[in-house]
C-alpha cells in the first residue's frame, strides 16, 4: 500500500521512514505543519521526490483516521 514508506526495526528505531532514507515520516509532516513548503523540503532533501512527501502525507492521514466502535457492539 505504501511503496515509498518503510518500517524497519534496525532503522530509526522502527519509525516509518521514506524508503531508502533515514528521514522519518513524522519529520516531513511536522515540517509541513510548521510552514515549510514542499519545494523547500525538496531543496533541503534533494535525494527525495515530491511523491515521497505525498506518501508521507497519505501515511499520516491513514494513521489519523478515526476508528469508531459502537458501544452496543462492545457491550454485546
Predicted segments, located by residue:
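Amphipathic, hydrophobic secondary-structure cores in small proteins
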Residues: 16-18, 23-59
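Basic, low-complexity segments
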Residues: 1-15
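C-terminal structural segments of small proteins and small subunits
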Residues: 48-76
Amino acid at each position: 500500500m505504501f511503496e515509498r514508506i518503510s518500517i524497519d526495526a534496525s532503522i530509526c528505531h522502527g519509525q516509518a521512514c521514506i524508503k531508502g532514507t533515514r528521514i522519518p515520516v513524522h519529520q516531513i509532516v511536522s515540517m509541513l505543519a510548521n510552514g515549510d513548503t514542499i519545494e523547500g523540503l525538496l531543496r533541503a532533501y534533494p535525494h527525495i521526490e515530491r511523491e515521497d512527501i505525498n506518501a508521507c502525507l497519505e501515511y499520516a492521514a491513514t494513521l489519523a483516521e478515526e476508528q469508531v466502535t459502537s458501544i452496543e457492539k462492545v457491550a454485546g
